[in-house]
């Protein structure tokens, strides 16, 4: 049998909120320093070394945190798909001089691109959709936004985008675009409009 395993998102390798808070970087979740890169590299090393069984952390978007009592079991996949905004980045943190990067373990990489105005629109639309659904759950980390009006919701989403997502996009994500083997350009309707393949 041919088995494809998706190791969910690299969010599973974020540090828990407790550690991020202790380091004063909870508001930088999604930036390079918020990931346990060593743990992710160890996982990929084990996969490439032929070890068959792997247990990886699970991230909950509802609780906005790593679930301490939950894990994902990956067993001997023929193809392993690792997805995340950080996976093509190189380590540039002070005091760290890793010569091995996450992307070194990839046989093929894909970057999904879109115009920034479309990304902003999608983010605001998704935030509003979640405000009316998942944010209503009292256990949700974002329950504090549940009673926002439509206009307040849009303003809050745009503020979060401007203060967190936009800097991360421009400083850390976009610069990795041309490190990918394949670039898919999406239009405002989410359909792929162009495909670029890096020639070797």
Where are these regions (language model features)?
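NTP-dependent small-molecule kinase module
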Residues: 75, 128-129, 145-200
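ATP-dependent NMP and nucleoside kinases share a basic, alpha-helical "lid"
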Residues: 66-135
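N-terminal leader/propeptide and maturation segments of large enzyme subunits in energy/redox metabolism
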Residues: 135-143
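Conserved nucleotide-sensing/catalytic segment adjacent to the nucleotide-binding pocket
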Residues: 3-67, 73, 79
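Hydrophobic/aromatic beta-strand patches that form the interior of the parallel beta-sheet core
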Residues: 6-8, 81, 108-110, 182-184
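Short glycine-/polar-rich loops that comprise or flank the Walker A/P-loop
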Residues: 3, 103-108, 178-181
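Conserved protein kinase catalytic core
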Residues: 15-17, 89-90, 119, 193
């Amino acid at each position: 049998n041919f088995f494809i395993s998706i190791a969910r998102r690299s969010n599973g390798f974020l540090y828990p909120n407790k550690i991020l808070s202790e380091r004063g970087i909870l508001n930088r979740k999604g930036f390079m320093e918020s990931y346990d890169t060593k743990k992710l590299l160890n996982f990929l090393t084990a996969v490439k070394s032929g070890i068959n069984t792997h247990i990886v952390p699970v991230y909950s978007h509802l609780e906005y945190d790593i679930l301490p009592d939950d894990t994902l079991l990956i067993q001997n996949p023929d193809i392993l798909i690792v997805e995340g905004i950080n996976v093509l980045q190189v380590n540039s943190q002070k005091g760290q001089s890793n010569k091995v990067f996450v992307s070194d373990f990839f046989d093929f990489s894909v970057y999904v691109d879109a115009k920034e105005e479309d990304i902003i629109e999608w983010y605001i639309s998704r935030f509003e959709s979640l405000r009316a659904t998942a944010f209503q759950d009292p256990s949700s980390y974002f329950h504090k936004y549940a009673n926002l009006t439509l206009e307040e919701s849009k303003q809050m989403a745009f503020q979060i985008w401007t203060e967190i997502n936009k800097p991360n996009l421009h400083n850390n994500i976009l610069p990795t675009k041309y490190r990918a083997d394949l670039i898919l350009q999406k239009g405002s309707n989410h359909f792929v409009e162009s495909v670029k393949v890096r020639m070797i």
